[in-house]
């Protein structure tokens, strides 16, 4: 059963890396380092105007599709920010239609790649529309508090 949601726009403030899925799957990716940096309490304390505690991972600035480079932003939802500390970035997640998928429960390093591989293999009909490749995001709520028995939701932007 497809879960298509109209999602309001919001802001995420955090840290970024430019990467691609081939690099991430090879073991030479940057996302693990982004998480290590983000999880330092001193970094989270610097995020201004936080309006939530659940980390959000944003995939944006796609070069092409899921095979090209993209910007990965890991942060927290925040109200609009004008001045940011060094090394932090703000991105606006646009309002729009998103297909929502829940991962299986298990170790994060296993369930996150698995859900994305399922999404990449889906036809537009299975997704509920054509992917926009503008912005996708993952929400790490309380179900992801235990990294060895976690579940996340993935929001895939649609046209």
Regions found by a protein language model. Name each.
Residues 1-159:
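A solvent-exposed interaction/effector surface
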């Amino acid at each position: 059963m497809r879960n298509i949601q109209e999602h309001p726009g919001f802001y995420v403030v955090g840290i970024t890396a430019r990467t691609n899925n081939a690099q991430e799957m090879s073991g030479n990716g940057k996302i693990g380092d982004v998480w290590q940096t983000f999880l330092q309490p001193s970094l989270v304390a610097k995020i201004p105007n936080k309006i939530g505690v659940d980390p959000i991972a944003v995939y944006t600035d796609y070069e092409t599709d899921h095979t090209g480079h993209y910007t990965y932003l890991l942060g927290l939802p925040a109200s609009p920010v004008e001045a940011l500390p060094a090394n932090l970035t703000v991105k606006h997640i646009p309002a729009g239609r998103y297909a929502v998928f829940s991962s299986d429960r298990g170790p994060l390093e296993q369930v996150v790649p698995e859900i994305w591989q399922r999404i990449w293999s889906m036809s537009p009909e299975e997704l509920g529309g054509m992917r926009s490749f503008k912005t996708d995001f993952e929400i790490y709520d309380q179900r992801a508090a235990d990294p060895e028995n976690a579940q996340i939701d993935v929001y895939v932007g649609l046209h």
